[in-house]
Amino acid sequence: MNIFNNNLHETDKEINEIIKHEKLRQSSVIELIASENFVSPAVLEAQGALLTNKYAEGYPSKRFYNGCEEVDKAENLAIERVKKLFNCKYANVQPHSGSQANQAVYLALLQPGDTVLGMSLDSGGHLTHGAAPNMSGKWFNAVSYSVNKETYLIDYDEIERLADLHKPKLLIAGFSAYPRNIDFAKFREIVDKVGAYFMADIAHIAGLVATGEHQSPIPYAHAVTSTTHKTLRGPRGGLILSNDEEIGHKINSALFPGLQGGPLMHIIAAKAVAFLENLQPEYKSYIQQVISNAKALASSLQERGYDILTGGTDNHIVLVDLRKDGITGKLAANSLDRAGITCNKNAIPFDETSPFITSGIRLGTPACTTRGFKEKDFVLVGHMVADILDGLKNNEDNSALEQQVLNEVTKLIELFPFYG
């Protein structure tokens, strides 16, 4: 076998078929998973480039390997572009994921056993914010704050009370399932009162922050972490930002050699391409459309009688509370999947069901907005979702309705282009 002459379909027919089938799946469903998006062909091309061959431990101009001249240029471009995008002084584009970006901040600023204060999982927080099964919950004394039991909004008074009581070394703002804006300035006030560090995890809302559609944490947080996919529409990966260059030096050392070895230079190049796309005027229009579409989706579900957590959304996330409907999140997500609508089961604040079952579903608009969906299309999507949920309330067998909605999905999705 001559590896330099064979294409994928010649070398590995099984993987080639899997990719073909996945392309068909992605092209034919309404994608409502809030953490997913579609990258541009340019980003795909960059992350499939031969930069994957290059080892580049260290940082630009300070590598442990020779032959890094070109990958240095790529990483410097990514750094400068993302600093411009977020108007900050420091950026590290090497984290392999958002989780590893968070871990690097912990390694830079904390010692094992230090107290961290983050949002609980059922309130919309992330595993890496102190959840018991995660490294952040095992290595540190993790304390969680919740949302208000009546409004389901972040309770800043409760956060301040917990901070005064537990004196955390690090306060974390950020979420994986919270549909409203965050007051980063208020978090900083609390941090300053107790002498803690402040980390903002903007993995979900990075695109909103970059375009000015959400308050930026850069002036307030000691460190800001994010993924580079989701609303940034780049390759899967992470990044760390700050205006404190001294903390930036600590984070650099924590990430390499503390946490990671060689960076993924093909992914960093793809990040640079995505950041260039994010700097274009049309990207702001895209983010505005993402938000408008989410509001339209939420309103259409409310019109059909479904409870939307917090009564609506300020971002790209719509959380549907199914408790009064007698439907589990798992049942709803699986039925929607069979109908060609992909989402995920999701815990609702103070959820008493198993995290593998849940009492709600999480819906998001970034992916379908990338394909060109507008408000009127998401109104239709909302009614499709409601039709499936209505069927689950009234019938044990939802298969006929699932097929009917699948036919509607197929007609709608064919109107919007996908990769050639």
From Swiss-Prot:
It comes from the Bacteria. Keywords: Amino-acid biosynthesis, Cytoplasm, One-carbon metabolism, Pyridoxal phosphate, Transferase. It is an enzyme of class 2 (transferase). One of its GO terms (molecular function) is pyridoxal phosphate binding. It catalyses: (6R)-5,10-methylene-5,6,7,8-tetrahydrofolate + glycine + H2O = (6S)-5,6,7,8-tetrahydrofolate + L-serine. The record marks H229 as: Plays an important role in substrate specificity. Pathway: One-carbon metabolism; tetrahydrofolate interconversion; Amino-acid biosynthesis; glycine biosynthesis; glycine from L-serine: step 1/1. The keyword Transferase applies. It holds the Pfam family SHMT. This is Serine hydroxymethyltransferase. It comes from Rickettsia rickettsii (strain Sheila Smith). The gene is glyA.
